[in-house]
Swiss-Prot record:
<protein>
    <recommendedName>
        <fullName>Transmembrane protein 141</fullName>
    </recommendedName>
</protein>
<dbReference type="GO" id="GO:0016020">
    <property type="term" value="C:membrane"/>
</dbReference>
<dbReference type="InterPro" id="IPR026788">
    <property type="entry name" value="Tmem141"/>
</dbReference>
<feature type="transmembrane region" description="Helical">
    <location>
        <begin position="62"/>
        <end position="78"/>
    </location>
</feature>
<dbReference type="Pfam" id="PF15110">
    <property type="entry name" value="TMEM141"/>
</dbReference>
<keyword id="KW-1133">Transmembrane helix</keyword>
<keyword id="KW-0472">Membrane</keyword>
<keyword id="KW-0812">Transmembrane</keyword>
<dbReference type="InterPro" id="IPR038259">
    <property type="entry name" value="Tmem141_sf"/>
</dbReference>
<feature type="transmembrane region" description="Helical">
    <location>
        <begin position="34"/>
        <end position="52"/>
    </location>
</feature>
<comment type="similarity">
    <text>Belongs to the TMEM141 family.</text>
</comment>
Length: 108
């Protein structure tokens, strides 16, 4: 058994897919970026709202809600983009081709 993060992967599976460790590290990095984007985006949006509260006053609960929604949207976008990069990496490690090259027809 090979340890892959918190889970264990059978040796046969790990030997069939030599890029599994790199893919797992990439996905882990993508999720960490997503969480940090959520925290940063929520905090930045909330701080920005506190700065403009004189011109556009509304209740505190709406400020929190708007900040959390903005942080969630930004986090989703960052995680989706980074996960797509990891999927492209996985395809490259498995096939040796980039995903854009897979659809082209090379005739000799």
């Amino acid at each position: 058994m090979v340890n892959l993060g918190l889970s264990r992967v059978d040796d046969a599976v790990a030997s069939k897919h030599p890029g599994l460790g790199e893919y797992a590290a990439c996905q882990s990095n993508a999720f960490v970026k997503g969480v940090s984007t959520f925290v940063t985006g929520t905090g930045a949006t909330f701080g920005l709202q506190m700065l403009v509260q004189r011109k556009l006053p509304y209740p505190f609960q709406w400020k929190v809600l708007l900040a959390v929604v903005a942080g969630s949207v930004a986090s989703y976008w960052v995680t989706r983009v980074e996960s797509q990069k990891c999927s492209n990496l996985w395809l490259f490690l498995e096939t040796g081709q980039l995903p854009k090259d897979m659809g082209t027809d090379r005739r000799s």
